[in-house]
Amino acid sequence: MKNWLICIDDTDDIGTKGTGEIAEEIAHLLANMSGGHASFVTRHQLFVHPDIPYTSHNSAMCFALRSPLTQAEIHQHAVAHLVAESAPAADPGIAILDVDSYYDAAALMDFGRRAKVEVITKAAAYDLAEQLNIQLTEHGGTGQGVIGALAGLGLRLMGSDGRVKGQIKLGQFEDVSLELSVADILEQTGLDAVMSTDKYRLALDERVQLKGKVKAVYLDHQFVLLVHQETEQWRNAGKQALQAY
């Protein structure tokens, strides 16, 4: 089996299925058809600027895939689903990286960092993809999604950028908290760790109060539930802490 990173961007429009949901569907499709394994999907925030078209937040969606499928097979099946599910007004792009191949990871990560703070052209994205032997293709509209798709690969490679798509729902509510051990949280969610906002890794027997919207992040190349300490009690991190990802 080989290791791949796959990222898509700009598949949606107001009132249509979100890019994150489409990415999850592609991840499950590729894993199930090949007996492989797909990771959580991570959402990577890109530059918000009047010159950049976006639906709501301008973010790319990326996942890792371990699979015996060839790159051609991955591209064929992923693109078929991408095209079928993308909104008619969207400008979708997809990037596929063979993680086990030789490529300039520093250049790819630099592209990702730049895409968070500046406007980048399609030509620049295609030039870098060609240099790094990354498959980068557009599938409708202006094809602007290729920029975010390539940037998302770089940001995922950095290892400490992005939130895990969706919310963690273990029985907590907006006004009702739930207390669980770290071990229970990891077992029920499939996350790798529970860490404080200053990167202290909680022990398995420590307890955390969950309340409201609970989201995980990608930190130190792991899927992590962020927490903070409040009145000597660990609680899930709030919106402000999550904005850094």
Please state what every model-predicted region is.
Residues K2-Y245:
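Conserved mixed alpha/beta catalytic, RNA-binding, or beta-rich assembly cores of soluble enzyme
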